[in-house]
Amino acid sequence: MNLENLSALDLGELVNKKIISPVEVIEYFEKRINERNSSINAFTYLNFEDARSEARLLEDKIMHGNYGGKLAGVPVALKDFLPTKKGWPATHGGVKSLQTIDDADSEFYRAARSLGAIAIGKTNAPSFGFRGTTDNKMFGPTSTPFNTQYNSGGSSGGSCAAVSDGLVYLAEVGIREIGRAHV
C-alpha cells in the first residue's frame, strides 16, 4: 500500500481500525524520507526515535479500545523558523548564532497531537523567514520535488516540499510577512 497516496483522514481511519499500526506508518515514512529527502532538502532535523516512541504509545491506546483521533498516526512536520516541540533544536531558519532548544510545544503541534498526529521532524526555512526562497547558510536550499532545478519558495518552502513530495501529510506553514506565504 502506498500510504502517501491516502488522505490524512483516511490514514487516521486505517490506524483507528487497526488495519495498520502507527509504528508501521512511522517506519514507512522514515524509509520514504531517507530515500527522497536528499534530492529536495526539505528537512533540517528528523527525530524518528521520538516519533516511534509516540507511535508505540498511540498503538497501545488504540489496542486497548480507545480512539486515537482523526489523525491517528499521521506524520507531520514542524517549521524550523518557529518554536516547535519541547526539547527539539531551533535555528530560526538556519541562523547559527540563534541556535536554541525549544522549551515548549507550538500551538500547531499541540493541535495536531491532540488529533493523534505524530511529529517526525523540522523543515527548512530561510534565515529569519525573510527571503522569497528557501535557502540558508546552515542547511542550504530546498528544491521543489517537481523540478529540483527550482527552489521551493518562501519561508515555508521546506514544509511545502515535504508535503508535495508525500513525505508527510501536514506541515506547519507560515506567517504572512511581506506577502510570501503564496510564493
Which ranges hold each PLM region?
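Gly/Ser-rich catalytic/binding loops embedded in alpha/beta enzyme cores
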Residues: 2-175
